[in-house]
Amino acid sequence: NPIIVSSCDLTHSVMGIKKCADAGAGAVVLKSIFEEQFLVKGEIPEAGQFMHPEALDYLRTGGLLEYAPQKICQTIEEAKKEVDIPLIASINCQTTKLWPRFAKQICEAGADALELNIYFLPLDLDESGSDFEQRHLEILNKVKDEVSIPVSIKLTSQITSLPNFAQRLADAGSDALVLFNWFLEPDIEVNSQTTKSIKGKGNLFQSLKWVALLADRVSCDIASSGGVKNSDDIVKMILAGSSAVQACSLFYKKGLGEIESLLNGVQDWMKDNQFFSTDDFKGNLSFIKQKLSFKNMGEANKYFRAQYLKTYSKFD
């Protein structure tokens, strides 16, 4: 079962996780916990008069953060008693030292795997692309030192050389890469001359392209995320080489009952095409399989360039 309910409100509670499992999900990614959720602001109730000012200031500036995942750990412990599908925890931190501490607590709570939901917007003019990538590698290395469960990284699509970076992450110990993370995007309201943020929409074809280009070329699993609307989209991703397919927007729109429809659609397609398991057709249309028809990478590049020109000429 390749269908994973991705990190969202549907997976933030034991009841929500159980509903996903009952609906047929192969796994769930718990709603991400963010470091900012646990920042202590203002007065700590009934604490000021009993605590030393330095201790109180310590708590306000992050001292409690090391113990912040307590609620999500409790959710994991309770959910493990209710469902038998893998529970993938998701964390998003800003402070480098907190990634491994959060990860260790979540691992000890019984999570089956961990997804690092890394989001750093490169605003600094002095930060190079390699600096940006190195921050990811540092986080991964520190987390892997603390946990024994599989660790995946959910990547943004805006990486200069994704194949190279993907392999470096795999070499550093990433067990899987999730393509892609769809962040909030800015918009401008022209009448009020104000800015607002809108949720980024998953682009199925962008994920499909990079799944196909990376599958079986980098030494870790590849999973997709974003844009799934029907069972054909699931089949496409597996043909491209995806080991699992994350989705959530579809379930918001049509309900968790849509998971059964997706599974039935995939099974019907497999029956029609005489496949007995997803492994039988996984990656059949990946780049590495099609590359066999090319003499070298240069010839492959020429092929993709020719396809681009052929398609572009239709609109000329």
Predicted regions and their residues:
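Alpha/beta enzyme core
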Residues: C8, V14-A47, Q70-I88, N92-S224, ...
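Short, glycine-/Ser/Thr-/acidic-enriched flexible segments
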Residues: L10-T11, Y252
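Short leucine-rich amphipathic alpha-helical surface patches
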Residues: S242, S249, V266-M270
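Helical hairpin unit composed of two closely spaced alpha helices linked by a short loop
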Residues: Q246-L250, K254
